[in-house]
Design a protein with these regions (language model features):
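Terminal beta-strand-rich extracellular "head" domains
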Residues: 1-69, 73-114
Length: 114
């Protein structure tokens, strides 16, 4: 079983997309193809106002795990054609104010014995 929760920030109000990578390649655990311009992703977060944090959360059972060492990671993109930095564990402003915070993200892998 694999699950992740990631807090991200972006300095624009577009959707963000999470992609699960297994062994350095995009996982097949991804949305179905729709229209030719639609993104396919493992997770998504609805765009909010600039400088606000968003949450990506996902959980799945990997039923054909490898018996050798395997790397898992999550990568993010956004729905804007311009270049924007995606911030992990804080919003894009990262101000030193009482109304801003830093967060924690997790990637958990549980091995289940038969």
């Amino acid at each position: 079983m694999l699950s992740y929760t990631t807090h991200i920030g972006l300095n624009t109000n577009v959707n963000t997309y999470g992609y699960l990578y297994i062994g350095g390649s995009v996982s097949t655990i991804i949305g179905d193809q729709g229209g030719s311009n639609q993104k396919r992703a493992t997770s998504t977060s609805q765009g909010v106002a600039s400088h606000k944090a968003m949450i990506h959360s996902f959980q799945t059972l990997i039923d054909n795990p490898s018996t050798s060492s395997t790397t898992y990671d999550v990568r993010f993109g956004h729905g804007n054609n311009a270049t924007h930095t995606i911030y992990i564990n804080n919003d894009s402003a990262d101000y030193n104010g009482a109304y801003y915070a830093r967060f924690v993200s997790t990637l958990t892998i549980l091995e289940l014995a038969p």
